Regions:
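Polybasic, proline/glycine-rich intrinsically disordered low-complexity segments
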Residues: 260-282
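Elongated alpha-helical scaffolds
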Residues: 47, 186-241
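A generic structural motif
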Residues: 77, 121-137
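Surface-exposed intrinsically disordered loops and tails
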Residues: 133-138, 173-178
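N-terminal-proximal low-complexity accessory segments that begin disordered
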Residues: 3-68
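Hydrophobic or amphipathic alpha-helical targeting/insertion segments
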Residues: 144-152, 221-230, 234-264
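Ser/Thr/Gly-rich low-complexity blocks that favor extended beta-strand/coil architectures
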Residues: 90-123, 137-166, 216-218, 225-229, ...
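Single conserved hydrophobic/aromatic residue that forms the stacking wall/gate
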Residues: 284-295
Length: 295
């Protein structure tokens, strides 16, 4: 599937037509170079890559190893919004990857992810997602206790402030503070999408913050963008000492792949590649993931 963005418009005028079988743009001395000719040169090469790629891969194929995963034991912990009068949302994300301990229970865990109320309408409290490492003081407690204070095993700095190891940095809600949510993950890789080989960054999404009885289609949302120097300052000319320094350069065509979830009844795949399907917490590999290569 070719890109959907039409570049044969002002100001790009990319009128490349594969039916004409033009394989090169032959620039000549004494003839001014047209902007469209520079763009068309790229389109000729892209058409060659797309023709080869389409012969090998189906749209949405994973080309360079990455992986998609589903976690239906994504342990959530709701925290009080402030600690000694300080809004914990100011610093809580600095604790991601850190080992924490419950002062009352003795339970140890590592913070994997943080979700704030302003980031997700389904969340009313600052919520951390943890992987539990050890049970508590009596070897029977496996989750943090409601209302208990938690400390970190190492110093954490935010701004000019340092929270020292062993200091209380947050407290759990007094009731129903712990539960089990669900999440999906994708690791870094390259996917063949719309004739291009697109880098995908490592991403994660919380499917359901406090329950793991999830039912969704999970995959990649495709966004095509035109990026100008106003969007990305690195596109201003960096040739310091020359007359064109700091002038806006050429625009860029960009494709971004973002991990998202869709309702299982949503069949609109116009800008979506399904990678897996979850039905009542049961995982099913999508047809697209099962058969991504040409036979």
């Amino acid at each position: 599937m070719a890109q959907k963005t039409n570049l044969n418009i002002n100001p790009y005028y990319d009128d490349f037509d594969p039916e004409k079988n033009y394989q090169k743009v032959l620039y000549k001395p004494g003839f001014p170079v047209q902007a469209r000719e520079l763009t068309t040169s790229q389109s000729i090469l892209q058409n060659q890559l797309e023709s080869f790629g389409t012969n090998i891969f189906k749209d949405g194929s994973l080309v360079v190893p990455g992986s998609i995963a589903y976690d239906n034991n994504y342990y959530s912990v709701k925290l009080k919004s402030s600690n000694f009068g300080i809004d914990i949302s100011l610093y809580i994300k600095n604790f991601i990857g850190k080992k924490i301990i419950g002062q009352t229970s003795g339970v140890e865990a590592k913070i994997r992810f943080v979700l704030l109320p302003e980031e997700d309408s389904r969340v009313d409290d600052v919520t951390i997602y943890v992987s539990y490492d050890t049970s508590g003081n009596d070897f029977s407690q496996t989750f943090f206790a409601d209302g208990e204070e938690i400390i970190c095993t190492e110093n954490v700095t935010y701004g000019l402030t340092t929270i020292n190891a062993g200091e209380v940095f947050a407290s759990l809600n007094t009731a129903d503070a712990t539960s089990v949510g669900s999440a999906a993950f994708i690791t870094k890789g390259v996917y063949f999408v719309r004739g291009y080989f697109i880098n995908v960054s490592e991403q994660k999404i919380v499917l359901d913050p406090y329950t793991n009885n999830s039912t969704y289609r999970v995959g990649l949302q495709i966004d095509e963008n035109i990026i100008t120097a106003k969007d990305d300052e690195s596109l201003f000319d960096n040739a310091k000492g020359f007359s064109n320094f700091a002038a806006p350069g050429a625009d860029r065509f960009q494709i971004v792949l973002t991990l998202i979830k869709k309702d299982i009844t949503d069949g609109d795949d116009t800008n979506f590649i399904e990678l897996m399907r979850i039905d009542s917490c049961l995982l099913y590999t999508s047809d697209a993931a099962d058969d991504l290569y040409r036979g």
